[in-house]
Amino acid sequence: MTCSITELAKKLISIPSVSPKDLGCQDIIIKRLCAIGFDIKRVNVNDTKNFWAFRGTGKTLTFAGHTDVVPIGQDKDWQTDPFQPVIRSGYLFGRGSADMKGALAAMITAAERFVNKFPNHKGRLSFLITSDEESSAVDGTIKIVEYLMSKRDMIDYCIVGEPSSTNIVGDVIKNGRRGSITANITIYGIQGHIAYPDLADNPIHKGLPVILKILSIKLDSGNDFFLPSSINIANIHAGNGFNNVIPGSLFVQFNIRFSSEVSEKHIQSQIVNILNSNDINYSIEWLFSGKPFITKKGLLIDTVIQSIFYFNKKKPILSTSGGTSDGRFIALMGSEVVELGLVNNTIHKVNECVKISDLKLLSCMYEDIMKNLLS
């Protein structure tokens, strides 16, 4: 079993599928799923490859994931070729090993074993796979969700294979994520010589008090599932590097991660009210990444906890920390969504790697969840 998982992971890692490119990863996965009786629906959009695979009918358990990876960074910083997977000291090295081609290999091999043992399983087992998770995410999972919703074909339970674990596989699972919205604000002044400030209008001087007011907004106090919402500056820029020029504009980018206690409209109104109450000329662009979502205790969480406890003899921590994930799109269907994946301490880093034993453990957990929900 370990060999099968490892070999599949190595095949996927060897393909340089930097987002949103797939470059053949999904063909490998689809071939294996077809061999065990899955029907396939491709939902490709622009440069993004997506597919929906399903087997059986009834209550639906979906495993969701992505074949794309982030860029490698500086090649010289890698100890090995990031797209030539290497096993060393019990670890599999390569870009995507932890995020999340290793988890994809664990899912597929788990499904193969499950179908072999339970060829007439109850319910429907399915896969939702995209190559646009690490970049814009506009042509990926959301397009499959829209396709399914147009057919009134809903997902009941979904396991997202994102690397949720901290120290050992299954020590942390994500039962929700915060929402995310970005405000790109440009404050306008009048460019001029810095020795003649009376002939110019410095947007930095005007903008700093406004920025501090925005940062001081208290949106909420959080709740049982989410920490308080946070506002942070992601980027700020003014001027052209010359020390004798008052710039004509100031750009500042705020990112807000928000709990279920507030809406994106409330956040927007709070920020716009501050901007309008000050004597400034500004423009603002909003980029909305997703609403917060939460899966409360129910059949899926109970089943996932049960499977993790069976192997680890310890229950996982339920968390909503971290960035956004494609779970936010699947949650739009009213699905119960849980993220369970590999250890995340090397994701997006040089020398990304995963324990071979963790691949085996995760695959066993996935198979046990299938068995408990569908056999």
Curated annotation (Swiss-Prot):
Keywords: Amino-acid biosynthesis, Cobalt, Diaminopimelate biosynthesis, Hydrolase, Lysine biosynthesis, Metal-binding, Zinc. Its EC number is 3.5.1.18. The active site is at residues 68, 133. It catalyses: N-succinyl-(2S,6S)-2,6-diaminopimelate + H2O = (2S,6S)-2,6-diaminopimelate + succinate. GO terms for molecular function: acetylornithine deacetylase activity; cobalt ion binding; succinyl-diaminopimelate desuccinylase activity; zinc ion binding. It comes from the Bacteria. SUPFAM superfamilies: Bacterial exopeptidase dimerisation domain, Zn-dependent exopeptidases. Zn(2+) 1 binds at residues 66, 99, 162. The keyword Nucleus does not apply. Binds 2 Zn(2+) or Co(2+) ions per subunit. Pathway: Amino-acid biosynthesis; L-lysine biosynthesis via DAP pathway; LL-2,6-diaminopimelate from (S)-tetrahydrodipicolinate (succinylase route): step 3/3. One of its GO terms (biological process) is L-arginine biosynthetic process. Transmembrane segments: none annotated. Zn(2+) 2 binds at residues 99, 134, 348. Its cofactor is Zn(2+); Co(2+). The keyword Metal-binding applies. Catalyzes the hydrolysis of N-succinyl-L,L-diaminopimelic acid (SDAP), forming succinate and LL-2,6-diaminopimelate (DAP), an intermediate involved in the bacterial biosynthesis of lysine and meso-diaminopimelic acid, an essential component of bacterial cell walls. HAMAP family: DapE. Homodimer. Belongs to the peptidase M20A family. DapE subfamily. This is Succinyl-diaminopimelate desuccinylase. It comes from Buchnera aphidicola subsp. Acyrthosiphon pisum (strain APS).
